[in-house]
Design a protein with these regions (language model features):
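FAD-binding subdomain of flavoenzyme oxidoreductases
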Residues: 106-108, 119, 123-124, 128-247, ...
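Generic non-transmembrane alpha-helical segments
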Residues: 7-19, 65-73, 129, 238-246, ...
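Short, ordered loop/turn segments at secondary-structure junctions
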Residues: 82-84, 142
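Short, well-ordered beta-strand elements within core beta-sheets of diverse protein domains
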Residues: 53-58, 223-228, 278-279
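N-terminal flexible segment immediately upstream of the FAD-binding catalytic core
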Residues: 1-68, 84-113, 260, 264-266, ...
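Short, surface-exposed ligand-recognition loops at beta-strand->loop->(often short) alpha-helix junctions
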Residues: 2-3, 227-235, 339-348
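C-terminal substrate-recognition/cap domain of FAD-linked oxidoreductases
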Residues: 31-34, 240-351
Length: 351
């Protein structure tokens, strides 16, 4: 096995160059991990797992040559975007080669309301470039400034924007994707429309995602609002109504019960101790209407900042989705989370 790995390393060096192969040290450890440690179960299972090497192909041809070499050597490969997932999808269970997609990051086109990009393109870059030409991403994770399109499609499901457009698997969001097969002579396979969802959330097990076309949404100028109430039920009633109001152009609706907001230290001066809060991204042309509607319901707006264009922090999205867990862990490392789903009768389910 060692001789085989040594031979493979030599071949991979000849393909990508010595500067784009990582064989040891902290860099290899980093490229072998994601945020799996959010889960105490995965932390125990995965903390000793790592790749034998990592490579950074800079073209589709280099990627094909790397995959072919690994296939011939019968060495497992694991694709990696930015490593911002929480479930260990990019952690190699059996050593082998991590393929880092960070150099395959081109935005190939932004035309007709469709982004055509390589798998390693960062969502933050796509969002910024799309907004320049009147568009924005339909949905993206809270890690959007760092995450890649390939990582989001293969390891994510939804996020900011899903309140309006649904998750990645909602009809029409994905136009097409191109996958590279893992075999001695790799092939490129194009899947279109609903067929492309066969590869959704499969972490590369169905092949390596090379290129993706995602439909975009018309650009909206947003305000970032935090709404507050000492009553969870009062806030929930208002937030639920806000979420259902189709005439309000929204990108985020997230409610937090106290003491969760106490973990958001950078926002402490805006938050009222004991209050539950709702974070809202809404069309700035509708902000006054939304704030007035909330006030009539007994809900106060305690934070109102525009989302700049191009987007620059601070972002209230940095406290939503799985970022919430990250802030909680900073306060108490023993905290983790469970996903729960609720139906239209969620109030009865709470009881």
């Amino acid at each position: 096995m060692e001789a085989s790995l040594d031979d493979l390393k030599s071949e991979l060096r000849s393909i990508v160059g010595a500067a784009d192969i990582v064989e040891s040290g902290e860099s290899l450890e980093t490229l072998s991990k994601d945020y799996y440690w959010y889960s105490p179960v995965l932390k125990r299972q995965l903390e000793e797992k790592r790749a034998d090497m990592a490579v950074r192909p800079g073209s589709v041809d280099q990627l094909s040559a790397v995959v072919a070499a690994c296939s011939r050597a019968r060495v497992p490969v694991v694709p990696r975007g930015a490593g911002t997932g929480n479930y260990g999808q990019c952690v190699p269970l059996y050593g082998g080669v991590v393929i880092d997609f960070s150099r395959l990051d081109k935005i190939l086109s932004l035309e007709g309301g469709v982004a055509r990009v390589q798998a390693g393109a960062r969502l933050g870059t796509i969002e910024s470039e799309a907004r320049k030409v009147g568009w924005e991403l339909r949905c993206m994770p809270s890690t959007w400034m760092k995450s890649t399109m390939g990582g989001f499609f293969c390891g994510g499901s939804g996020g900011i924007g899903s309140i309006t457009w649904g998750g990645i698997n909602a009809p029409g969001n994905v136009k097409s994707l191109t996958i590279m097969t893992c075999e001695d002579s790799p092939r490129l396979v194009r899947l279109e429309e609903a067929e492309s969802l066969k590869a959704l959330h499969t972490y590369g097990t169905t092949g390596l995602l090379v290129e993706i076309e995602m439909r975009l949404a018309p650009k909206v100028d947003y305000d970032q609002l935090i709404l507050s109430s000492p009553s969870w039920d009062t806030l929930l009633d208002w937030t639920h109504e806000a979420a259902k109001r189709l005439e309000w152009r929204k990108r985020l609706v997230t409610q937090f019960e106290w003491p969760i907001p106490s973990y958001f230290k950078p926002l402490a001066k805006y938050l009222r101790p004991g209050d539950s809060v709702t974070f809202l991204l809404v069309d700035k042309a509708q902000t006054a209407e939304v704030v007035a509607h909330a006030a009539k319901a007994g809900v106060a707006c305690v934070y109102n900042r525009p989302l700049t264009d191009p987007p620059k922090p601070p972002f209230i999205t940095d406290y939503t989705w799985n970022h919430t867990t990250l802030w909680a862990i900073k306060a108490d490392p023993t905290i983790t989370y469970l996903h729960s789903g609720f139906g239209p009768n969620f109030r009865q389910q709470f009881a």
